[in-house]
Amino acid sequence: MKVNLLLQKSLLLFATVLSAHAQEKPVKVFILSGQSNMVGAGKVDGGGTRWGSEIIDPVVSVYGGTYNPKADYDALRPIKTLKLEFFGGTNPTPYPGGGVQVTRGFVQIKESGIYEFRPGYGGSSNCLMEVGGKEVHRQDPGGEAIRAEIKLEGGQKVPFKIIYFTKDANGLGWTARLDVPGSLKTLVKFGGKYPYLMNNKGQWTARDDVYYRGVVTATGSRWMGVQGGRIGPELGFGHSVGEAIDEPVLVLKTSQGNRSLGWDFLPPGSKQYEFEGKIYAGYKESPLSWNKGAEPKPIDWYAGKQYDDCFSAAHEVLDNFDTQFPHWKGRGYEIAGFAWWQGDKDRYNLAHAKKYEENLVHLITTLRSEFKAPNAKFVVATLGQTAKDSDDVNERLILDAQLAVDGTAKKYPGFKGNVGTVYTHPLSQGGASNSHYNGNSQTYMDVGLAMGEAMMKLLKGK
């Protein structure tokens, strides 16, 4: 018994020492960058749409007195009724007032699915709404809205009723489809995927060990979780590395849509070159290209402008680390890795596509040098629509370049064990990079998770 007790105390002390040691270590920073799909276009849900043509024959009835929860308003005689010519939208027909107001009518949804109803705005949200006899919304004055989802068949007319608890009553309201194919809410709530993103109350959760800081686009400063209507790969990436690393993690994303590596993100030190009778700009030169022998006429953009904008913004965050992240004040940080998902725009320009591999190699070495992180790992993700047997010349040039920098390809000995490429074609749920993979959040989550797993393999030397 004494031996077991001594062993338990020793294990507890060891765990405490390990925990304290992890707290003392610098924050692990991962810098994510790229174009629009790194920015993020994965749908979180279907969003709410204002009531409109789906509401049929709305009529408001007014009953004397104030709201009585014990009253059966279907059995009582109203003191007045009004057919509502306009219901929903932004300018519904005003209610007459003068008592308890109850609206009745029908709902006819176009597409079958699972829906949520959000009646009212401000004070008029204090009401009870039933659809098809089921209570779908209740908000008592001073309380929070309690809603229940309901499954509706497209084209079917279903009766609805709204009882307003106060004199604030109007025809404003919204409907949200909860099971939009490919949306994150559908995947989590109805598809059983990524259960760690939502609690048992159906609310999005946030990690307390991974912090998100977005600059340039997809801006934000918060603990990693779902916020807003779109996600990028940072959500899956953050979860993947957060689960594997003891120290706290900062995911610093700096990205911009519709940008090429051969022009907008061209790294410092890149030289101009000739291709098919044209001179293509080197870093800080303008325009993108000009005829050989002609005098270039600069425009209000230059080669590498987006590189400068994105990574100077990242520097600004890191240079003010204690101010930006007071919860980590005095702890310091270490840039552990970079993650890059880009290539769509380069595939529209043969010169850029042919130069992509050289530019990508230069990007990797330049970022490590610029951020004084020579040992930082680097993960590249390919374009989801491009298969290894694709016969599209430009897309294959981009894909082959991205695969070539992987350390296991052995083309660049200096990248062995520190650069990895994620082949995302098997992870794509359809669409293409230029259509943002149809907004399918599974693509964004799975690519992010895979990039995080690839990063951890590099960090662990596997």
Locate each region found by the language model.
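Bacterial N-terminal signal peptides that target proteins for export
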Residues: M1-L11
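A composition/secondary-structure signal for short, hydrophobic, low-basic-content segments
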Residues: N4, V17-S19, I31
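Conserved Rossmann-like nucleotide-binding pocket used by diverse enzymes
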Residues: L7, L18, V379
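A periodicity- and composition-biased signal for non-globular, repetitive helical segments
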Residues: Q8, F14-A15, A41
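Hydrophobic h-region of N-terminal signal peptides that target proteins for export
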Residues: L12-A22
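Cell-envelope and extracellular/periplasmic
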Residues: Q23-D72, R177-K462
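Acidic/polar, compositionally biased interaction segments
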Residues: E54-G182
